[in-house]
C-alpha cells in the first residue's frame, strides 16, 4: 500500500480575531471526544483575550497578585500561565497513534517548531530537558502544555511576539519563581507580526512529510 495514503490530512485554522479561552477549550475537548480514526488532524493558530490558565499541576500560590484577569482551570499539563494579544497560541489536535508519535515526540516537535520559526529571524533559541518550553539566553519565549486522551492530543504552545508582559508579573510563570519572559519584539527590531508568523507555521507544516494534505481555513 502506498505510504501517502496512510498519512493523515491536516486542517490549519488561522483565526484573525481574539478568542475567548474557555470557549475554545470546550471546542477542543469536544472535537477530541467526537473524532474517530478517519477524522483529520487539526492545528488552530490564534490569539486569546487576556486570561490566566491553571494547568493540572498548577497551585493557587503561583498566582502572586490579585488582578481583574479571569482565571480558568484547564486540563492541560503544566502550571499557571498567561495568554493574551500579541502572543501566538497553537493548538494541536493530533491523533498520536496514527502519526506513530508518543508524548515526547509531540513535545519535541512543538519545541522545535518554535525554535525553527524564530531562527528565520536570527533568534537563537533552545529547549531544556528539565523545563519544557523554549528559551533565549535563559529567558523564556515559548511555553507549552498538552492533554492526551485516548492517544489524541489537544492544547499546545504559546509564543511571545509583542504581548504585554505585565500579565506574567502577576504569576510565577509555569510555576518557576522569578522566571523572566522575553518576546520576539525584544530581540528583533523589524520583528514579524502574528499574521506573518501564522503564514510561517503554515509553510512549515506544508514542508513536513508527516501529513498527506494540508488545508488552510481563515476564520
Curated annotation (Swiss-Prot):
Domain named BPL/LPL catalytic: residues: 37-219
Coiled coil: none
Localization annotation: Cytoplasm
Residues that hold substrate according to the record: 76-83, 143-145, 156-158
GO biological process assignments: protein modification process
Active site: 174 (acyl-thioester intermediate)
Pfam families xref list: LplA-B_cat (PF21948)
Domain of life where this protein originates: Bacteria
Reactions it catalyzes: octanoyl-[ACP] + L-lysyl-[protein] = N(6)-octanoyl-L-lysyl-[protein] + holo-[ACP] + H(+)
GO molecular function: lipoyl(octanoyl) transferase activity
Chief site of localization: cytoplasm
Keywords: Acyltransferase, Cytoplasm, Transferase
Pathway: Protein modification; protein lipoylation via endogenous pathway; protein N(6)-(lipoyl)lysine from octanoyl-[acyl-carrier-protein]: step 1/2
Record has Transmembrane helix as a keyword: no
Other notes: In the reaction, the free carboxyl group of octanoic acid is attached via an amide linkage to the epsilon-amino group of a specific lysine residue of lipoyl domains of lipoate-dependent enzymes.
Functional description taken from the UniProt entry: Catalyzes the transfer of endogenously produced octanoic acid from octanoyl-acyl-carrier-protein onto the lipoyl domains of lipoate-dependent enzymes. Lipoyl-ACP can also act as a substrate although octanoyl-ACP is likely to be the physiological substrate.
Family assignment from sequence similarity: Belongs to the LipB family.
Protein known as: Octanoyltransferase
Lineage: Bacteria, Pseudomonadati, Pseudomonadota, Gammaproteobacteria, Moraxellales
